[in-house]
From Swiss-Prot:
SUPFAM superfamilies: beta and beta-prime subunits of DNA dependent RNA-polymerase. Keywords: DNA-directed RNA polymerase, Nucleotidyltransferase, Transcription, Transferase. The lineage of its organism: Bacteria, Bacillati, Cyanobacteriota, Cyanophyceae, Synechococcales. HAMAP family: RNApol_bact_RpoB. DNA-dependent RNA polymerase catalyzes the transcription of DNA into RNA using the four ribonucleoside triphosphates as substrates. The keyword Nucleotidyltransferase applies. This is DNA-directed RNA polymerase subunit beta. It comes from Prochlorococcus marinus (strain MIT 9303). GO terms for biological process: DNA-templated transcription.
Length: 1097
């Protein structure tokens, strides 16, 4: 297929760097965030005030990491750098200054791709969206339906302050949700006189009631106010004026305890129209008075005061890696401060050095805890390049300091008008996290304050100005402007053509003449996220299905031979490039060497730059990472040019699936309920074959009885089973293994106790010690097979870090090629998913008039009710493109080029394709878009014409091989003695309440009885049944299920006298062991507890 790509809809879409949000944030942390923390935390003085320790924050340095990225992955190490900072210890009494560079901990570094390597695994720090610090005004209804207003001052860290009005027109204040205090008490405690307050208010008459109320309570001076404040905030403690003063000081005016942050100061200044410099991060008297004034104006409905919408993106901000890491460093430094103060007190003042005072452990622990176990530090989704990119651009409302799933209501999850161009309205998970986890829109960026901005072109007097850089606006600023959508029609000069333009203004829609338009959106794609922007004809799909389409593209398995889509949207190249999966040239120059493992580019100065390629590496999701060069020796290259394709890429574009010939028609019921009928060609030609790499690991540990040994000498194993093992007992690379084969031979010493009787007998007769080791080898699990592609051995001698108690760790990587098969899940890009129900020989598939058999048959009933008609457009556009031998890029939302534009474009292309010689049958004017298909089995044409075309269909990661599972006998749960659940536990299928009802409805009493006893948790019964089946005897009657005994014990533990009786009223002791061969009962019975004697009385 020729690679000429036709751009159907021309819009200038220059996407920004898509991983910028991660990289910029980490750079900020290194340049500013870390220094800020080190500075804020020094000096540290001891309790006597003699010693001071200063950290010189801007003189910190990072050492070169011990391992590079690849080495860190291979050794299971962390890609991190050591932090050193200059410290000065000042002795106030002698004036002596000791200066020294001190190691304060290790800092994991971000890779070029925006990820972190922690213990050899690639992780991503997800961005968190939280409520911005600032002041918020809300209204509430009290019990009598009267509206009251309140104002909350929310800091970045520290106590919340909440002012409230009530039905008696009094003002109250709460500190951190404690009891209400008269607002004027707080004013007096802060040292403000009545006149100070009244002068600042525009409507002081409302406030005077609160002054009178305070006077009536007998609080007229600052001291009395401080006592009252202390009583309310610390009830039960003896109040004192100095205590009150200290409490107020530490709660709101101490920078270490209370911090509005740069953002909080900015928001408060903006809301209350103040001009306090942004270095003042604590509360000021002016803040409190202005808040009161605003609240009174709200209550009286004057002065243009307005309520805040907490779901507005102007009031929510994004915390990226840098800030989350900074918070964590602060936690570590606070712990360190305590340790330093203790050491200053304990140590000899004269001989102390900074290095003795500073212990790196608390900081290391805090950072490690964040990267290892924080909710926001996630194992990277590496299924394909798109999944990786989307993961880095994810924005979560969960996590520390955020919401919880249970508490989040509908309003938080809902789409808000301010999301426009900032958060994608479509891409979010289905299920409990819907709306709490979002994705950044394509053009959005996060500004210095953490608010999301989106770009616009300026409009002056109805003329669109596209010179220079677009203007980025945050949600707050955008509300004040009239913004037209990106698909307005303009003439060549940029003059807007329509007489009335729909614009968004203050979260509403109105129509205005072009002269009143302030800005125009940059591109139609800027509203949606990266994954959604890859869906062609998106505007014809229902949002629910587009959501599924976006999510399923992230689950597409990279195929053996990727093929880029015939119908794309023009963003495929950038997605592949920014995902970090494809190597990019760093210089302008010439390719001097290419092979499968490396590409060397010589720049204009004659310097060689080597790009090493990944070959068959295992991704986090067990898919295969492999890079193939696409440049040849002697090719000139420019900076930023793609040199090689990664997994799921072709020609530098993302290629998640295959373009296959699809027909929408029923076929013998095989595509009932979304099932999919596919041709054998997809299996034979390896169209949907993918490579999966599994990792198997075993460690040889030190046991009480001696060390475990990795060896070829395994007891009771035939020589042919050891054929592929080397002299150490480890499988050779390249061997083909099936389930049950030995990968690594290991023997464990066994003690006297775990020897079977026959072995004891042998030893008694011959006196020889049978080799007292047990086979504990690593074997291939059931249902798995494949070829060994890599073996890695880690020992302490080589300098590898091993888990405690382990002497050696061996890892074997096994690759398997998985062809498509019945039970695999496939999907299109429009949320049309299904399971393969049958693979037909190609001669039985319906075929086209020119004899080409169809590849996939989909059910036409899957389209109308789900309203994802985009798939039909894609399929027909693909059909035209395949016949014209080209590829097409369709930008979504094409109505700016005219009404019904998609339909016209597709039809025009189909007509164009039919003009080619011998291709007249491609377009049938009577049934546009449909063809007469012929039944492959009978050779007869079908009754009706059928929609046929090329669509991109993906194979998803939910493969039947990983899901299919059966159990005969296996492990049981300890308490209930029922079989475990799940494939990993070798579990059974649960026969639940509803299944029991079904059997009851049929009266299948015996079937039901054995399902609930012998096949489940009647311990003695199941052993006897197994015995009877093996010996061919009749199966004995079942006994009592163990879970019934557990229920009885639980009721007895509540103090209820519950027991089981026969018809004659005689008590049956279920707990007694019925097996006569074991004389000792397994559990204490009623008799042994002496209950029997008690009953006879």
């Amino acid at each position: 297929m020729s690679s000429s790509a036709i751009q159907v809809a021309k819009t200038a879409t220059y996407l920004p760097d898509l991983v910028e949000v991660q990289r910029a944030s980490f750079k900020w942390f290194l340049d500013e965030g870390l220094i800020e923390e080190l500075d804020s935390f020094s000096p540290i003085t001891d309790y006597t005030g003699k010693l001071e320790l200063h950290f010189v924050g801007n003189e910190y340095r990072l050492k070169r990491p011990r391992h590079d990225v690849e080495e860190a992955k291979r050794r299971d190490a962390t890609f991190a750098s050591q932090m050193y900072v200059t410290c000065r210890l000042v002795n106030k009494e002698t004036g002596e200054i000791k200066e020294q560079e001190v190691f304060i901990g290790e800092l994991p570094l971000m890779t070029e791709r925006g990820t972190f390597i922690i213990n050899g695994a690639e992780r991503v720090i997800v961005n968190q969206i939280v409520r911005s610090p600032g002041v918020y005004f809300k209204d509430e209804q009290d019990k009598n339906g009267r509206r009251t207003y309140n104002a909350s001052v929310i800091p970045n860290r520290g106590a919340w302050l909440k002012f409230e009005t009530d039905k008696n027109d009094l003002l109250h204040v709460r500190v951190d949700k404690t009891r209400k205090i008269n607002a004027h008490v707080l004013m007096r405690a802060m040292g403000l006189s009545d006149n100070d307050v009244i002068d600042k208010l525009r409507h002081p008459e409302y406030y005077k009631k609160s002054i009178e109320a305070a006077n009536e309570e007998g609080i007229s001076s600052e001291d009395q106010a401080l006592l009252e404040l202390y009583k309310k905030l610390r009830p039960g403690e003896p109040p004192s004026v100095s205590g009150g003063q200290q409490l107020l000081q530490t709660r709101f005016f101490d920078p270490k305890r209370y911090d509005l942050g740069r953002v909080g100061r900015y928001k408060i200044n903006k809301k209350l129209r103040l001009t306090i410099p942004d270095t003042v991060r604590t509360l000021t008297h002016e803040d409190v008075l202005s808040t009161l004034d605003y609240l009174i104006n709200l209550e009286l409905d004057v002065g243009g005061a307005s309520l805040d919408d907490i779901d507005h993106l102007g009031n929510r901000r994004v915390r990226s890696v840098g800030e989350l890491l900074q918070n964590q460093v602060r936690v570590g430094l606070n712990r360190l401060e305590r340790i330093i103060k203790e050491r200053m007190t304990v140590g000899e003042t004269d001989s102390l050095t900074p290095a003795q005072l500073v212990n790196p452990k608390p900081l290391v622990a805090a950072v490690k805890e964040f990267f290892g176990s924080s909710q926001l530090s996630q194992f990277m989704d590496q299924t394909n390049p798109l999944a990786e990119l989307t993961h880095k651009r994810r924005i979560s409302a969960l996590g520390p300091g955020g919401l919880t799933r249970e508490r989040a209501g509908f309003a938080v999850r809902d789409i808000h008008p301010s999301h426009y161009g900032r958060l994608c309205p479509i891409e979010t998970p289905e299920g409990p996290n819907a709306g709490l986890i979002n994705s950044l829109a394509t053009h959005a960026r996060v500004n210095q304050y953490g608010f999301i901005e989106t770009p616009f072109w300026k409009v002056e007097n109805g003329r669109l100005i596209k010179e220079g850089d677009p203007i980025y606006l945050s949600a707050d600023l955008e509300d004040e402007c009239r913004v037209a959508p990106g698909d307005v029609a303009t003439d060549a000069d940029g003059q807007i053509l329509a007489e009335l333009i729909p614009v968004r203004y203050r979260q509403d829609f109105e129509k205005v003449p072009p002269e009143q338009v302030d800005y125009v959106q940059l591109s139609p794609v800027q509203v949606i996220s990266v994954a959604t922007s890859l869906i062609p004809f998106l505007e014809h799909d229902d949002a629910n299905r587009a959501l599924m389409g976006s999510n399923m593209q992230r689950q597409a398995v990279p195929l053996l031979r990727p093929e880029r889509p015939l119908v794309g949207t023009g963003l495929e190249t950038q997605v592949a490039r920014d995902s970090g999966m494809v190597p990019i040239s760093r210089v302008n120059g010439m390719v001097t060497f290419v092979d499968a493992t490396a590409i060397i580019v010589r720049d204009e100065d004659g310097v060689d730059h080597t790009h090493y390629l990944q070959k068959y590496q295992r991704s986090n999701q067990d898919t295969c990472l492999n890079q193939r060069p696409i440049v040849c020796q002697g090719d000139p290259v420019i900076v930023g040019q793609v040199l090689a394709d990664g997994s799921a890429c072709e020609g530098g574009e993302i290629a998640l699936g295959q373009n296959v010939l699809v027909a929408y028609m029923p076929w013998e019921g095989y595509n009932y309920e979304d099932a999919i009928l596919v041709s054998e060609r997809l299996v034979k030609d390896d169209l949907y074959t993918s490579v999966h790499i599994e990792k198997y690991e075993i460690e040889a540990r030190q046991t009480k009885l001696g060390p475990e040994e990795i060896t070829r000498e395994i007891p009771n194993v035939a020589e042919e089973s050891l054929g592929n093992l080397d002299e150490m007992g480890i499988i050779r690379i390249g061997a083909f293994v099936e389930s049950g084969d030995i990968l690594v031979g290991k023997v464990t010493p066994k003690g006297e106790s775990d020897q079977p009787p026959e072995e004891k007998l042998l030893r008694a007769i011959f006196g020889e010690k049978a080799r007292d080791v047990r086979d504990n080898s690593l074997r291939v699990p059931s249902t798995e097979r494949g070829r060994v592609v890599d073996v890695r051995i880690y020992t302490r001698e080589q300098g590898d870090e091993l888990p405690p108690g382990a002497n050696m760790v061996a890892r074997v990587y096994v690759a398997q090629r998985r062809k498509i098969q019945v039970g695999d899940k496939m999907a299109g890009r429009h949320g049309n998913k299904g399971i393969i129900s049958r693979i037909l020989p190609r001669e039985d598939m319906p075929f086209l008039p020119d004899g080409t058999p169809v590849d996939i048959v989909l059910n036409p009933l899957g389209v109308p009710s789900r309203m994802n008609v985009g798939q039909v457009f894609e399929c027909l556009m693909g059909w035209a493109a395949a016949n014209l031998d080209c590829r097409v890029k369709v930008v979504p939302f094409d109505e700016m080029y005219g009404a019904e534009k998609s339909q016209q474009t597709v039809e025009a292309y189909l007509k164009e394709a039919a003009k080619q010689p011998g291709k007249e049958w491609v377009y049938n004017p009577e049934n546009p878009g449909k063809l007469q298909l012929i039944d492959g089995r009978s050779g007869e044409p079908f009754d009706q014409p059928v929609t046929v075309g090329y669509a991109q269909i993906l194979k998803l990661v939910h493969l039947v091989d990983d899901k299919i599972h059966a159990r005969s006998t296996g492990p049981y749960s300890l308490v209930t003695q029922q079989p475990l659940g799940g494939k990993a536990q070798q579990g059974g299928q649960r026969l639940g309440e509803m299944e029991v009802w079904a059997l009851e409805a049929y009266g299948a009493a015996y079937t039901l009885q054995e399902l609930l006893t012998v096949k489940s948790d009647d311990m003695q019964g199941r052993n006897e049944a197994l015995n009877a089946i093996v010996k061919g005897k009749p199966i004995p009657r079942p006994g009592t299920p163990e879970s019934f005994k557990v229920l009885m014990r639980e009721l007895q533990s509540l103090g209820l006298d519950i027991a089981v009786y026969t018809d004659e009223g005689k008590e049956v002791d279920l707990m007694q062991d019925v097996n006569p061969r074991r004389s000792t009962p397994s559990r204490p019975t009623y008799e042994s507890l002496g209950v029997a004697d008690y009953d006879e009385d």
